[in-house]
Amino acid sequence: MANATMKKTKLAKKMLVVEDEGEMCLILDLILSERQLESDYVNNLLDADEYLQKNKPSAIILDNKLPDGYGVDFITYAKKKYPDTKIIMITGFGTARDVAMENGADYFLEKPFSLQNVNDAIDAVFAMK
């Protein structure tokens, strides 16, 4: 019971990862776990929307090309409904940077990226007010 109490009082930041590639989820899970961040994973935009209706993550790591649409299009919707949630856009398409940022992404990472790139992105969005 003591652990449950400790867990309730812990002010961990929670991340939602929206990514359909299993290997990428594993990599991100290792990074987020190392930083002692809580994280949940979904692999499409519909599940992301359902998750956001019930949970309030501090930030979202959002892939662009997903089975049911494009992350860049989801950014505008998510920012309207959940303006305080920070969004880190990740994609293998650097050309999506301008659209992602115009739509409200707080940070953009192009695949492939390094551990330091991910840590810099997380630090940057958590430093934002």
Task: State each model region's role.
Residues 73, 94-109:
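Alpha4 helix (beta4-alpha4-beta5 surface) of REC/receiver domains from two-component response regulators
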Residues 1-14, 116-129:
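Non-catalytic signal-transmission and effector/linker regions of two-component phosphorelay proteins
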Residues 21-40:
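Two-component/phosphorelay signaling modules centered on CheY-like receiver
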Residues 63:
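Active-site residues of response regulator receiver
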Residues 67:
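The feature encodes the CheY-like receiver
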Residues 44, 70-73:
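Acidic catalytic/metal-coordinating carboxylates
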Residues 41-59:
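Acidic, metal-coordinating helix/loop segments flanking the phosphotransfer/catalytic sites
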